[in-house]
C-alpha cells in the first residue's frame, strides 16, 4: 500500500508546485511573482523588461517593476505618490563601473535639468554599486516622501533621500530615453524582450 501511495504523493506535490508558479511571470529564465508585499503595501507586477546592451543586443538584466496601481502610462507611474519597487535580475556578470556609467547616462538622458540638485545623492547611490554576477539582484524601493531604498543582492545599503531623487532615478527606465526601448515597453506591460 505504501508503494502505491508514494507516486500519488509525488504527483500531488509536483502539481502543487506547478500551481504555485502559475501566478508568476517569466522572462528569459527569470521568474517573478505577480504580487509582492513591501512593508505594509501590496504591490502588483506592472511589467518585465529586458535590458540589452550594445549593437549586439547582449542581455544584461531582466527588470521587474511593481506598483500600487498597474498602468501603461510612464508619467502616471512616476507621478504617483505611492510605493514602487524595481528589481534588476542580472543574467550576466556586470562590472560595478559599468553600472555606475549606466546610471550617469540615465540621469543625463532623463533628468538633465535636475542634475545639479541630485549630484551628491547620485554619488551616494554610486558608492553602493559593486560588480554583479549572473543570478544576483539590485533592488530599489521608492517610498513616498522618503526616497529610494537600495538593496544589493539581499543586503540593504541605505536610502537615498528625496522624492525628487526617486522620480529622477525611476525615469532612467520610464523616461523619454530609456536604456533600450524594449525595456521601457516591457515595464509598462508590453512584451519582455
Label the model's feature ranges:
Residues 69-143:
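Mid-length scaffold segments of soluble, non-membrane domains
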Residues 157-183:
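Flexible glycine-rich active-site/ligand-binding loops centered on an Asp-His dyad
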Residues 182-193:
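Cysteine/selenocysteine-centered motifs that mediate thiol-based redox chemistry or coordinate metal-sulfur cofactors
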Residues 152-154:
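Short strand-turn-strand beta-turns centered on an Asx-Gly dipeptide
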Residues 24-78, 113:
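N-terminal secretory signal peptides
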Residues 19-21:
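N-terminal signal peptide c-region/cleavage motif recognized by signal peptidases
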Residues 1-9:
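Bacterial N-terminal signal peptides that target proteins for export
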Amino acid at each position: 500500500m505504501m508503494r502505491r501511495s508514494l507516486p500519488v504523493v509525488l504527483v500531488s506535490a509536483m502539481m502543487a508546485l506547478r500551481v504555485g508558479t502559475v501566478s508568476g511571470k517569466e522572462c528569459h529564465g527569470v521568474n517573478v511573482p505577480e504580487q509582492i508585499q513591501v512593508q505594509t503595501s501590496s504591490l502588483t507586477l506592472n511589467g518585465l523588461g529586458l535590458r540589452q546592451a550594445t549593437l549586439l543586443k547582449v542581455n544584461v538584466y531582466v527588470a521587474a517593476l511593481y506598483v500600487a496601481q498597474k498602468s501603461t502610462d510612464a508619467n502616471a507611474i512616476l507621478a504617483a505618490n505611492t510605493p514602487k519597487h524595481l528589481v534588476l535580475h542580472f543574467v550576466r556578470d556586470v562590472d560595478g563601473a559599468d553600472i555606475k556609467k549606466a546610471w550617469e547616462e540615465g540621469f543625463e538622458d532623463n533628468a538633465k535639468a535636475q542634475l545639479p540638485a541630485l549630484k551628491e545623492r547620485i554619488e551616494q547611490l554610486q558608492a553602493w554599486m559593486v560588480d554583479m554576477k549572473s543570478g544576483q539582484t539590485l533592488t530599489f524601493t521608492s517610498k513616498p516622501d522618503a526616497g529610494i531604498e537600495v538593496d544589493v543582492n539581499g543586503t540593504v545599503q541605505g536610502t537615498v533621500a528625496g522624492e525628487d531623487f526617486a522620480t529622477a532615478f525611476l525615469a532612467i527606465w520610464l523616461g523619454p530615453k530609456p536604456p533600450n526601448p524594449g525595456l521601457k515597453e516591457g515595464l509598462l506591460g508590453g512584451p519582455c524582450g
